Structure formats: structure tokens, C-alpha cells
């Protein structure tokens, strides 16, 4: 863990300069402190997401170990915003139970991303397998310029 926030050097980290990220800038996120923009103090509240762009779709991958697909929501909004949210509830305590350690995260999470203009918002698909949520956002095909041959006279 670095003591210096990775604002400029890590292309994979959420950056305040990323035009597609709608997350609130949190200077303490990279230092390992609890998030300042969330009431939760768990790592689950700061769910990390990988977003890659391939020639055809944008692909989002989210590690959500222990969650069922019924506990996760994937939504799209009018302004090309993709929202991924969910909640893991705290295990109910029985007064006869003696807890020795409680380290698993619980709480709510929500991440929002503004998608590029070429995203086909009406064709977004999501699947969940082995605790990994995959959201696929197809892209509009780039129209290739039409090339017309000109006959040379003379």
C-alpha cells in the first residue's frame, strides 16, 4: 500500500480526472481509511469495478463474493448513466452466540458511471457467476466512410 494517493499514475484507479466516473473524489480511499462519502466503514462499501472497452462492447466486472443476484441491481438512466448497487445484510446475532471474530463486510454499495455516446443503452446485459457480476454494454458500430471510385476520362 502506497502512502501517496495514486491520482496521476495508475490508469486503472478511479481518478478525479476520469470524465466517465461519477464517484465523489475521496482522497483517503487509496490510503486505506474508511470512505468519507459513505456512512459505511467496510470495504464492501467501496466495491471496486473493472471497466474495459473492447472493439464491440464495454465490459464491467464486479467482485461481489457471497451476494446473490437478487441482492444486486443494475440500472440504466436516461443520461447514459449505468448504476450498479446492492446490499449485504449483517448476520443476525443470537444472544446465545459468542462471536470470536467478525471480519466479513456488510452494508450497501452503489457505483455510477457515465457511458460514452456510442453505448447502446437499450441492449445492456448483466450476468452473475461465482460472485462476479459482468455487465456488457454493446457499442454502436462505427460507420466506415463510403469509398467511391471515380472513373478517369481521357
Curated annotation (Swiss-Prot):
Q: Which GO terms describe its cellular component?
A: cytoplasm
**Subcellular location field:** Cytoplasm
- Is tRNA processing among this UniProt entry's keywords? no
An example GO biological process term is:
response to heat
Segments forming domain sHSP: 40-154
> Cytoplasm among the record's keywords?
yes
Judging by the UniProt lineage, the source's domain of life is: Eukaryota
Q: Which Pfam families match?
A: HSP20 (PF00011)
Concerning CDD domains, the annotation shows:
ACD_ScHsp26_like (cd06472)
Key words of the record: Cytoplasm, Stress response
Bilayer-spanning residue ranges: none
Any one GO MF term held by the record is: unfolded protein binding
User: Which family is it part of?
Assistant: Belongs to the small heat shock protein (HSP20) family.
> How does the annotation summarize its subunit structure?
Forms oligomeric structures.
Q: Write down what this protein is called.
A: 17.8 kDa class I heat shock protein
Source organism per UniProt? Solanum lycopersicum (Tomato)
Amino acid at each position: 500500500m502506497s502512502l501517496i494517493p495514486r491520482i496521476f499514475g495508475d490508469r486503472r484507479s478511479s481518478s478525479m480526472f476520469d470524465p466517465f466516473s461519477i464517484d465523489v473524489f475521496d482522497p483517503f480511499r487509496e490510503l486505506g481509511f474508511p470512505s468519507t462519502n459513505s456512512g459505511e466503514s467496510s470495504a464492501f462499501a467501496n466495491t471496486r469495478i473493472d471497466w474495459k472497452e473492447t472493439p464491440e462492447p464495454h465490459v464491467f466486472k464486479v467482485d461481489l463474493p457471497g451476494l446473490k443476484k437478487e441482492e444486486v441491481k443494475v440500472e440504466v438512466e436516461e443520461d447514459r448513466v449505468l448504476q450498479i448497487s446492492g446490499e449485504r445484510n449483517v448476520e443476525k446475532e443470537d444472544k446465545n452466540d459468542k462471536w470470536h471474530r467478525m471480519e466479513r463486510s456488510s452494508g450497501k454499495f452503489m457505483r455510477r458511471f457515465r457511458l460514452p455516446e456510442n453505448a447502446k443503452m437499450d441492449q445492456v446485459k448483466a450476468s452473475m457467476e461465482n460472485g462476479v457480476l459482468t455487465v456488457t454494454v454493446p457499442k454502436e458500430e462505427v460507420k466506415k466512410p463510403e469509398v467511391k471510385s471515380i472513373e478517369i476520362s481521357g
